[in-house]
């Protein structure tokens, strides 16, 4: 396991904690964790990236301690445009003009949003477990995928949201238990990852992220309105992109990420990993790392 080198930067809204690893002079690769997860999920992939000569920047996303909001009055807004702006703010604070981005789940959605809104900042883009959604528009899926999204619908009723507030760790554990074939994690790893899940901001960001997709009148943060409008205008991405999908992903049906090539003007490829579920970077880190390294090398 790579040594944790935890650092802090301040932005207008956040104190962002991030792990900085690999050669200091290596080309930067930003690794964005998903939900429910934490930066430690990238440990094995990060080691391989370091061995290839690159530097990794692995932030704790908003809501995930030790990242924290500077003001209690800031809306706990969990939309991808906010997460993308956080990533840009972090890159600006570190003086990174361009970087490769690799994201899983929420991190994948954030990576696509970066590709839509800030393509000039990206050298390459890898997205794990979530297919691209043109214009950032959420549509109610077919009944099969809607069944998989039960956890999103639960959050959209007040009683469900209250149940999650009472036991966020238990709620997260159900996802780990059911989104992949069994046997991919142990109790110690889940416990270490879930340390931040009881934080009130983790719960607030979780609920806002999902409720704002489907529930009218959910709290938003108006400072991101212009980014949201721009996102709705972007259908095609130009950044060289790799999509990695587990063939046994029981959260996001693999068919949801098929046949998306037409939305990419740059190079695009999709890698389907047999026997792998929703957490490819944890379940098959060597395959993921090798694919990401090839992407970054080919992107130049």
List the predicted regions and their residue ranges.
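Hydrophobic residues on the short alpha-helix immediately C-terminal to a glycine-rich phosphate/catalytic loop
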Residues: 45, 114, 291-295
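Catalytic active-site module of serine/aspartate enzymes centered on a nucleophile-bearing elbow/loop
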Residues: 267-300
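Conserved beta-strand scaffold positions in the cores of enzyme catalytic domains, especially
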Residues: 6-8, 56-58, 243, 270-272
């Amino acid at each position: 396991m790579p040594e944790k080198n935890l650092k802090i930067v301040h932005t207008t809204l956040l104190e962002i904690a991030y792990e900085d690893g690999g050669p200091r002079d290596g080309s930067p690769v930003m690794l964005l964790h998903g939900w429910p997860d934490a930066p430690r999920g990238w440990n094995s992939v990060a080691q391989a990236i370091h061995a290839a000569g690159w530097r990794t920047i692995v932030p704790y996303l908003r809501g995930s301690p030790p990242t924290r909001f500077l003001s209690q009055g800031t809306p706990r807004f969990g939309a991808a445009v906010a997460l993308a702006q956080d990533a840009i703010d972090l890159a600006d604070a570190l003086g990174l003009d361009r970087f490769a981005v690799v994201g899983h789940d929420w991190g994948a959605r954030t990576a696509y949003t970066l590709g839509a809104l800030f393509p000039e900042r990206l050298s390459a883009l890898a997205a794990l477990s979530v297919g691209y959604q043109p214009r950032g528009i959420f549509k109610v899926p077919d009944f099969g995928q809607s069944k998989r999204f039960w956890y999103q619908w639960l959050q959209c009723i007040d009683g469900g949201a209250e149940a999650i507030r009472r036991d966020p760790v238990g709620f997260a554990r159900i996802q780990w238990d059911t989104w992949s074939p069994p046997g991919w994690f142990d109790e110690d790893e889940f416990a270490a990852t879930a340390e931040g899940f009881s934080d009130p901001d983790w719960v607030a960001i979780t609920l806002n992220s999902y409720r704002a997709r489907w529930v009218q009148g959910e709290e938003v943060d108006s400072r991101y309105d212009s980014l949201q409008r721009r996102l709705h205008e972007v259908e095609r991405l130009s950044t060289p992109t790799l999509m990695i999908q587990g063939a046994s992903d029981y959260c996001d049906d693999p068919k949801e990420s098929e046949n998306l090539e037409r939305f990419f003007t740059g190079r695009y490829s999709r890698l389907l990993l047999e026997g792998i579920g929703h957490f490819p970077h944890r379940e098959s880190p060597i395959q993921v790392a090798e694919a990401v390294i090839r992407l970054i090398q080919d992107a130049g």
